[in-house]
């Protein structure tokens, strides 16, 4: 499963094509951009949502119908949907994004990670990708030294 899908917090995945080189993947992606949105609603992604296998199968069929004929041979009609599971103990009912630029110290009980986000017990979430280059220290107050 591509890291990109995990970064976006996908709960289900279905590989629809396999190509011998990257340029073909780009051509398929350009065709599919016309019918599929390429934006992730980060708030919705941080909720517990079960995978929708039927929706993935229907999306594969839409892709098949809209893909240019010369790209059709690369489609994989028999792949089965995969479930992606993240290490999250619980999902808070309400979430609030926190930034290390505005709040340089973040503390609290970590419930898990999903996609690019760390999820804290109080509903705060931290987008790790937005903080590339930051130096952070992680401490466990219960650790015995």
What positions do the PLM features span?
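Short glycine-rich, low-complexity segments
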Residues: 11-105, 112, 124-145
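Short aromatic-glycine-enriched beta-strand elements
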Residues: 116-120
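OB-fold and OB-like beta-barrel modules that bind single-stranded nucleic acids
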Residues: 1, 108-110
């Amino acid at each position: 499963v591509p890291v990109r899908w995990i970064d976006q917090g996908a709960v289900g995945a279905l590989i629809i094509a396999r190509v011998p080189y990257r340029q073909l993947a780009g051509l398929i992606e350009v065709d599919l951009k016309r019918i599929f949105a390429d934006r992730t609603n980060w708030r919705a992604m941080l909720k517990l949502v079960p995978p929708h296998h039927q929706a993935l199968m229907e999306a594969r069929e839409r892709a098949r119908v809209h893909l240019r004929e010369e790209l059709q041979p690369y489609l994989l009609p028999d792949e089965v949907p995969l479930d992606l599971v993240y290490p999250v103990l619980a999902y808070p009912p309400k979430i609030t994004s926190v930034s290390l630029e505005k709040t340089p110290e973040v503390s609290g009980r970590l419930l898990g990670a999903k996609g690019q986000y760390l999820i804290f017990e109080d509903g705060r979430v931290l987008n790790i990708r937005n903080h590339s280059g930051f130096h952070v220290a992680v401490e466990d107050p219960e650790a015995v030294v």
